[in-house]
UniProtKB/Swiss-Prot annotation:
Pathway: Amino-acid biosynthesis; L-arginine biosynthesis; L-arginine from L-ornithine and carbamoyl phosphate: step 2/3; Nitrogen metabolism; urea cycle; (N(omega)-L-arginino)succinate from L-aspartate and L-citrulline: step 1/1. Homotetramer. One of the enzymes of the urea cycle, the metabolic pathway transforming neurotoxic amonia produced by protein catabolism into inocuous urea in the liver of ureotelic animals. Catalyzes the formation of arginosuccinate from aspartate, citrulline and ATP and together with ASL it is responsible for the biosynthesis of arginine in most body tissues. L-citrulline binds at Y88, S93, N124, R128, S181, S190, E271, Y283. It catalyses: L-citrulline + L-aspartate + ATP = 2-(N(omega)-L-arginino)succinate + AMP + diphosphate + H(+). Keywords: Amino-acid biosynthesis, Arginine biosynthesis, ATP-binding, Cytoplasm, Ligase, Nucleotide-binding, Phosphoprotein, Urea cycle. Coiled coil: none annotated. It comes from the Eukaryota. ATP binds at residues 11-19, 37, 116-124. Gene3D superfamilies: Argininosuccinate synthetase, chain A, domain 2, HUPs, Single helix bin. It comes from Xenopus tropicalis. PANTHER family: ARGININOSUCCINATE SYNTHASE. The keyword rRNA-binding does not apply. This is Argininosuccinate synthase.
Length: 412
């Protein structure tokens, strides 16, 4: 019997690609530990465990990461109002460091020298996985089959994988595969590739799994009161049904349910991948969309204007750091600490209506609001003397006058 090349912890999904990779790694002489993270995807985890064992995995770890994913990754993104290129709420990007961190913990526990994943050589996920692994386990060696010529020259497409699967008794799907790829977690579902690579092609009607068609969604809204403390959602109350949810996971799942029912959170975009190419992605982010709108509102109500300007810039950098895979970088740690500081007084309740694919803010209240109703009132003078505006306007007009004086002199 040939000597093992070493132990490798494989980020395993139970799908065709990683099942073939598991067998291929064994074929190359490695002992394989399969690791499957439960981050809220629709998956038969016990079936995946049995499949990995039958394919020859030495051990199988199935880790429930849902609560950790929400509290340690999604909540900081909510606090930041993190959004990539103005539209993408980063569902996949946030999940990757969460998954990879646990993969590293398992590798250290099992004294595994290697980790492996099934991310392609053109996408962002390879970067996100590997930067996390190298940050948290600098000595680790990474096996990325889709970047290895001996693998990608052998498996040039799905048909080659199917043939390999049949040869090695790897169970394959009995139903035809959708002509696109899909990635799901508790925050969102992403769809890309296949027929979606042509940016002119409309999303097929049966594509969306997390949200209903807004056109055929209920005609009556759900009214939700969302309470925040230090920028984190701590309670959701449905004012009609009088139901409440206050645990991080329960709250988020409930918002997914309500938003999905009303078709909230769909986007179809072209984005810039970190490695330089543009890609088309379709995303469903129901709960995240509600929280983004609600948090924006309570933050504007409670945060100083100049602090908010700085925080908005940091939020953009934070979104880029997440998207590009730098969650465990010193710069991302610094930005997170600044955002956490900015949220100290972001406390209050926001009332939203959820209807026909939209989230409407109806009202808000906060114990530490910077909104002064008397000061802003047209009926009460208060501490503000309208005559003071004259000097303010003249000072701000000074540079405008000088600029246009110069422009006029140039023309003459």
């Amino acid at each position: 019997m040939s000597q093992s090349k070493g132990m490798v912890v494989l980020a395993y999904s139970g799908g065709l690609d990683t099942s073939c990779i598991l067998v291929w790694l064994k074929e190359q002489g490695y002992d394989v530990i399969a690791y499957l993270a439960n981050i809220g995807q629709n998956e038969d985890f016990e079936a995946a465990r049995k499949k990995a064992v039958n394919l020859g995995a030495k051990k199988v770890y199935i880790e429930d990461m849902r609560q950790q994913f929400v509290e340690e990754y999604i909540w900081p993104a909510v606090q930041a109002n993190a959004i990539y290129e103005d539209r993408y709420l980063l569902g996949t990007s946030l999940a990757r460091p969460c998954i990879a961190k646990k993969q590293v913990e398992i590798a250290k526990k099992e004294a595994a020298e290697y980790v492996s994943h099934g991310a392609t050589g053109k996408g962002n996920d390879q970067i996100r996985f590997e930067l996390t692994c190298y940050a948290l386990y600098p000595e680790v060696k990474i096996i990325a089959p889709w970047r290895m010529p001996e693998f990608y020259n052998r498996f040039r497409g799905r048909s080659d994988l199917m043939e390999y699967a049949k040869k090695h008794n790897i169970p394959v799907p009995v139903t035809p595969k959708d002509p696109w790829s899909m990635d799901e977690n508790i925050m969102h579902i992403s769809y890309e590739g296949g027929i979606l690579e042509n940016p002119k092609n409309h999303a097929p009607p049966g594509l969306y799994l997390k949200t209903k068609n807004p056109a055929t969604s209920p005609n009556e809204p759900d009214i939700l009161e969302i309470e925040f403390k230090k920028g984190v959602p701590v309670k959701v109350t449905n004012t009609k049904e009088k139901t409440q949810h206050s645990s991080a996971l329960g709250l988020f799942c409930y918002l997914n349910e309500v938003a999905g029912k009303h078709g909230v959170g769909r986007i179809d975009i072209v984005e810039n991948r970190f490695i330089g190419m543009k890609s088309r992605g379709i995303y469903e982010t129901p709960a995240g969309t509600i929280l983004y709108q609600a948090h924006l509102d309570v933050e504007a109500f409670t945060m100083d204007r100049e602090v908010r300007k700085i925080k908005q810039h940091l939020s953009q950098r934070f979104a880029e750091q997440i998207y590009n895979g730098f969650w465990y970088s010193p710069e991302c740690e610094f930005v997170r600490s600044c955002i956490t500081k900015s949220q100290e007084m972001v406390e209050g309740k926001v009332l939203v209506s959820v209807l026909k694919g939209q989230v409407y803010v109806l009202g808000r209240e906060a114990p530490h609001s910077l909104y002064n109703e008397e000061l802003v009132s047209m009926d009460v003078q208060g501490d503000y003397d309208p005559a003071d505006a004259c000097g303010f306007i003249r000072i701000n007009a000074l540079r405008l006058k000088e600029f246009h004086r110069l422009q006029k002199s140039k023309k003459n």
